[in-house]
Regions:
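GHKL-type ATPase core
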Residues: 1-9, 20-146
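GHKL/Histidine-kinase-like ATPase module
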Residues: 72-76, 109-237
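Structural motif corresponding to the C-terminal cap of alpha-helices
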Residues: 17-25, 205-212
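Generic beta-structure capping elements
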Residues: 16, 65-67, 93-95, 169-171, ...
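Pseudouridine synthase
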Residues: 13, 45, 50, 196, ...
């Protein structure tokens, strides 16, 4: 139970708005998100929403329905003398009619599939499944290889920074292109982390070209214009 709210923490996290550790400014964290809004809004826009979790000693199960209007009492059971499996499982039935749909569209399905691959690529130590099939990505390099015709054209490195992985290839768009993640959150517009790595690569590469090919006048900006950069970063925020 939560010390002050007098309710189980899973119910507080998944069934009540404005409850999340991200509200606190003190301390640093390596997570993203919007105060748990994703899970709560999923509950609100679902006909049925079930949370199951276990710490190996106790299992917890709770069900909401009717767009979070109805909340059943949680089922809490001891695992007994034998230490059980630690897990968290969220199952939901989206209220498609609320959005004017009768089935999940191909566009939404493709978006979900892309996000599943994002999760697998950023967390290679976690088994991630899509429609019951294991997404076989053993590293961020494997994930980056999905975006180029030839995986051998991708150069990868961790830069010696824990939580960072970088992959770079030539851009097929004849201009600087990129995708990136910060704390497992997709940063489609890039940002300081992308510019930092791009400049870190382009400047010395331009110098190397100038030294080995004096007749060429290549600038870092020109190198960057032919770069396809993929970055996974962990940043304390």
């Amino acid at each position: 139970l939560h010390k002050t709210e007098n309710m189980y923490i899973p119910e507080l996290i998944f069934g009540h708005l404005l409850t999340g550790s991200n509200f606190r400014d003190e301390g640093s964290r390596l997570t993203g998100g919007r105060h748990g809004y994703g899970a709560k809004l999923t509950n609100i826009f679902s006909k049925e929403f079930i949370v199951e979790t276990s710490d190996g000693k106790t299992t917890y199960r709770q069900r909401w329905c009717d767009n979070m209007r109805s909340c059943e009492e949680p089922e809490v059971r001891s695992c007994g003398d034998k230490f059980g499996e630690e897990f968290t499982r969220v199952t939901f039935v989206p209220d498609l009619e609320h959005f004017g749909d009768v089935a999940v569209s191909e566009t939404i399905l493709a978006t979900l599939r892309r996000r599943v691959y994002d999760v697998a690529g950023c967390n290679p130590d976690v088994d991630v499944f899509f429609n019951g099939e294991l997404v076989e990505l053993s590293s961020f390099a494997d994930y980056a290889g999905l975006f180029v015709k030839n995986k051998d054209d991708v150069v990868t490195t961790s830069l010696g920074i824990p939580g960072w992985d970088v992959a770079v290839s030539t851009s097929s768009e004849q201009q600087f292109s990129h995708f990136s993640f910060v704390n497992n959150m997709a940063t489609h517009r890039g940002g300081t982390h992308v510019n930092l790595i791009a400049d870190h690569i382009a400047a010395p590469l331009a110098k190397h070209i100038a030294r080995t090919n004096p007749e060429l006048n290549v600038t870092p900006a020109q190198v960057k214009a032919h770069m396809f950069l993929m970055v996974k970063a962990s940043v304390c925020i």
